[in-house]
Amino acid sequence: MKKHLLFWSILFCNAAVAQTFSGGTGTKSDPYLISNVNDLKELSNMTDTPGADGTQQTYGKFFRLTQDITEPFVGIIGYEGFFKGDFDGGGHCITLNINMPTDNYVGLFGTVKSGAVHDLAVSGSVVGCNYVGGIVANPTNEALLYNLCNYADVKSTSTSMLSCVGGVIGGIISKAEGTMQGATVSCCANYGNVSSDGCALGGVIGYSGQQTGNTISDVANYGFVESSNSKRIAGTIGNPMWNDKVHRIANFGMLSSEDFSGCIGNANPTDIGEIIYDRQMAHSSVSIPAQERNTAELLGEGQKETLGDSWVYADGMLPRPNMNGLENSDIAVLYATPVILADGDKLDSVTKNFRVSLGNVENGKVVWKANNGLVEIQGDGTAIIHGAGTEVLTATYNSASRNVAIIIKGTDGINSINVSRNTGDDVWRNLSGQAVSTPTHGIYIRNGKKVIVR
């Protein structure tokens, strides 16, 4: 009987080290090739199964994604174990459909321990409980994460004080040992919706702490951050700790509550600088004047002196972290072309005509339209208000689209209908001068005067 057990043990161990990826031998010069969902499943099995000598099989191994994977991947790489190799996404995107609402450490990668994940985007949906991130749920020790882009919607079902939820990274939780330094995160961006009713929530990173100093630089949130809670929640990093190094961080996305911090929340690292956020998109009662900017101030090279050379700048567009080409994806370009409100206005309180960015790209302009008829968008991007209420603006760029809802409170300086009997042009015209046969709700020009029709 023991001979049979020994035979099956040897067979199992041999099977554990034999890999069947789309190619490669796992070396730096000949990495394992990841081309489909089956390869991702193989990597997940490899990560969770110890090798013949009991060591982590991914240690010292290299992996490269060869193409976008559009078939949804429903698993986790490093759920039972941890990833300790080098995963090069090659600038490609993996579609996710991970629905594990009662599980912790949920993301494309569950735990990355002193491994590297870079040059990768994910899309789709990720749902978990605590420590939930679109790309990495829990990087630890000297994990190296850079050039990462999340398009997925990331949701946590937790109401915990330490939910640790982020678009790119959930929570950097585990303690670095001995002389090890903390994790390094650089040149990452979130474009997805991030939501939880727990604490420690951020557009890019939920929580960073319990290590001997993590280094976080050149990261930005463009997505929507939503919670019914208000503690340790911010546009970009929910809860960095005092010993972190945090530099060149930006939030250009929207927040569901003004009780959130505009860019980083809760703790205040001693080594921190170059933090900015768009106060017209991310209206926050936690006001830090040195960090606040109007949208118009953020366009082009307006913040280059603050953010430096690791960002991409273009006229009429928001800065983007240089992510080795991922910053030029359709989604990244689209979210860098904002609604540009007048000074003093915010998304939930628009009182003046405004502009929309058309981008500054080689492959065509961003196209905007207003869905409820309260705003007229002209060819140069000027947006003319024709009435009060909620307007939904839709922006499209190639294959990508997004909606921006604004609440129009009315137009400054016009409070009633002005009926004129003066001679002259008796034709009803909109504010761009075009004749209107039957005026509806909005602002018009008639007989040389502005008239509001309620």
Please annotate each region the language model reported.
Residues 139, 379-388:
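Extracellular/luminal low-complexity segments enriched in Ser/Thr/Pro
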Residues 335-345, 407-432:
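Residue-level detector of functionally pivotal "anchor" positions at catalytic/ligand-binding pockets or at interdomain
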Residues 389-398:
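A short beta-strand micro-motif common to beta-rich folds, especially ectodomain repeats
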Residues 335-366:
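Solvent-exposed, low-complexity, repeat-rich "mucin-like" stalks and linkers
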